[in-house]
A protein has these predicted regions:
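Conserved small/polar residues in nucleotide/adenosyl-binding loops
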Residues: 401-407
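Short hydrophobic/aromatic-enriched beta-strand-loop microsegments
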Residues: 133-136, 245-251
Length: 408
């Protein structure tokens, strides 16, 4: 804590001198264990575990929750949108509707991890290396005497990857025809084929089909069609079902704010304390709402995989000093109907937590953002499609390890 920080806290007149002196030399000395960034996780699982003196663990609580909750929320929403696009490119276009500057910049980073190919936020490219790109604005078109002049000038200034916004006046009667004319007069003679148009209003499915027909008839089969305008996974799924002729989706406000579910409810709870003799004493939070009752104790998280398919079968929590023997048959059960059991034989098991900090020192080698994105895609692929349904997904179980029954 800086001198300025200490003086501010002193001015509140609620902290004693000893505490303020402690903050002057404060440093984190504990251990932190976490799943790799990009790992799909499920409710009631410990994404991150802090083992530290109580005051140190409490002082970092708010920032840990802020970072994990927001990034997990946006990455999850992005992943749903990318899966709905079924192989079509998805770009993050949400900066102007984000909840603050940090929400825009960090949100675009999370969207990239979730599967977006790039962002319209240049600052995210500068800070994190997420590929930035974009298209023209309606104001560009409006500043010229004619729509064609706007398109031609844009193609001359930005000949590489020129994407023309065709809905300022009339998409099919002027926008697409003027775009075709500009492409054929400016870019095609130079041998440039990397260009496109963007649809930002109207019936995107209908307009994309008509625009595609017009472009193809003009010999511009190479021209890409980008669609934007309040898109999310549900609308994109509908557009795909309607066979809309869209190559790239630019998704803004409904991604960067996770509009359909704008809160990620991660919590930070005490699970155990260590007494003077070094014994770990489990702690539990009781609630009349069963969903808010915490699983006590200092825990490890394991994931089981089917060896034949490579798909994840279930996750299991065990106490820190327990180990799951992956060489023996292992019984899992439905936690809502414990008489329903299944014995795993041809499986592998993986502990998901890795050490990030040890005795206050960073010991984890941070992968590149591209490596995190790739890891996220690989791990998401290990989940059954039924688990990833948008509506009524199949239950994926996080179980409590029972050593007596599990390895019979």
């Amino acid at each position: 804590f800086s001198a300025e920080d200490i003086e501010f806290l002193r001015s509140k007149k609620i902290f004693d001198k000893e505490f303020l002196e402690y903050l002057k030399d404060f440093r984190f000395t504990g251990d932190i264990y976490a799943v790799h960034e990009g790992t799909p996780v499920f409710p009631h699982e410990p994404v991150l575990t802090v083992k530290a003196p109580a005051i140190e663990a409490q002082l970092i609580e708010t920032y840990i929750l802020l970072a994990i909750n927001h990034q997990s929320l946006i990455a999850t929403k992005a992943n749903r949108i990318v899966r709905a696009a079924n192989g079509r490119t998805v770009l993050e276009f949400g900066s102007r509707r984000a909840q603050g500057a940090d929400g825009a910049v960090i949100g675009a980073r999370a969207a990239y991890i979730g599967g977006c190919a790039g962002t319209a936020c240049t600052l995210t490219d500068f800070k994190y290396g997420v590929p930035a790109g974009g298209t023209m604005a309606h104001s560009w078109v409006q500043m010229f005497d004619t729509e064609y002049d706007a398109f031609r000038t844009y193609c001359e200034i930005y000949p590489d990857n020129a994407v023309l916004l065709v809905d300022t006046y009339n998409t099919l009667k002027s926008g697409v025809p003027n775009a075709i004319k500009a492409f054929k007069e400016v870019l095609v003679p130079k041998g440039i084929t990397n260009f496109g148009i963007r649809l930002d209003s109207g019936d995107i499915s209908y307009l994309s089909k008509r625009a595609r027909k017009m472009l193809d008839e003009a010999g511009l089969q190479c021209c890409k069609i980008v669609a934007s305008n309040s898109l999310d996974e549900y609308l994109i799924r509908d557009l795909m079902m309607q066979e809309a002729k869209i190559d790239t989706f630019g998704v803004g406000e409904r991604l960067i704010t996770a509009k359909s579910a704008p809160v990620f409810g991660g919590v930070y709870k005490l699970a155990a304390v260590e007494d003077e003799q070094g014994n770990i004493i489990p702690k539990i939070k009781i609630s009349e709402n069963t969903a808010k009752i915490t699983n006590p104790h200092y825990k490890k998280l394991y994931r089981f995989y089917d060896n034949e398919s490579g798909k994840a079968l279930a996750d299991e929590l065990c106490v820190y000093d327990e180990t799951i023997d992956g060489t023996k048959p292992h019984t899992i059960f439905d936690p809502d109907a414990i008489w329903k059991t299944k014995t795993l034989t041809d499986y592998s098991v993986k502990e998901l937590h890795v050490t990030v900090f040890k005795n206050g020192e960073l010991v984890y080698k941070q992968p590149s953002l591209f490596e995190i994105k790739r890891y996220c895609a690989e791990q998401t692929e290990t989940l059954w499609d039924e688990v990833k349904r948008f509506e009524n997904p199949h239950n994926y179980y996080c179980l409590l390890y029972t050593s007596d029954a599990a390895d019979d």
